[in-house]
Amino acid sequence: MENSVNNCVRQRVFSNHQIRMIHEEEDHEESSWIVYFEDIDHDDEMVETEGEMTHYYDNDSSMISDAASPVHTTKINNVVRRKANNINTNPKKRRIIHQHKEEEEEELQKGEEEEEDEEDTASSPSNKTKIFSVLDHANDNTRYGKTMDNVTSEEIGCITETGSKIKEIMNEEFSAELKKRGLCVVPLSMLSNFIA
């Protein structure tokens, strides 16, 4: 009886050729049902599991399943199960996966060590740059009653120089980071001259 139900179901499903004919006759937008039927027709092949030949319609009461049916999830589960069995039985694949996991762990450990080193140097007071000490000195002068009106031109020049140096350093670091990623910063005027 089970075989007669399967044969009946198989006979009522459209073949790939019939779907193509329907699709060629209709010149307007492709229906999602056509894709659905093509998928069903593609999956209509028999799947051998545990020595038996079974069909995925066996557990379905309707001829064509609706969106709430487990047909799609069953298909995904079968694929996942096959891949898992393939990896577990093949010792070469197991070795490759094991090596890949070890490499990832080593990279994570190296990255954590580098972050710790960077934090140590950044937080130590001996590694402060001269630029920040000059700016701190200028701020100290304003605290002790020396306003910007009383600042000499030499001090103003020093502060503007340090500010421009900071901007240059930041731009260089930004450009270096972009170059590492394969990007290049080009002035807009240079680009417009190239296009024109």
UniProtKB/Swiss-Prot annotation:
Segments of this protein annotated with the region Disordered: 84-130
Does the entry feature the keyword tRNA-binding, yes or no? no
Compositional bias (Acidic residues): 103-121
Q: Which GO terms describe its molecular function?
A: kinase activity
GO biological process per UniProt: multidimensional cell growth; xylem development
Transferase as a keyword? yes
- Residue ranges of the TM segments: none
Top-rank taxon of the source lineage equals: Eukaryota
Q: Which UniProt keywords apply?
A: Kinase, Transferase
InterPro entries (alphabetical): VUP (IPR039280)
Its function? Involved in the regulation of plant growth.
- Additional observations: Plants overexpressing VUP2 exhibit severe dwarfism.
- What protein name is recorded for this chain? Vascular-related unknown protein 2
Q: Which organism is it from?
A: Arabidopsis thaliana (Mouse-ear cress)
- Specify the taxonomic lineage: Eukaryota, Viridiplantae, Streptophyta, Embryophyta, Tracheophyta
Identify the coding gene. Answer: VUP2
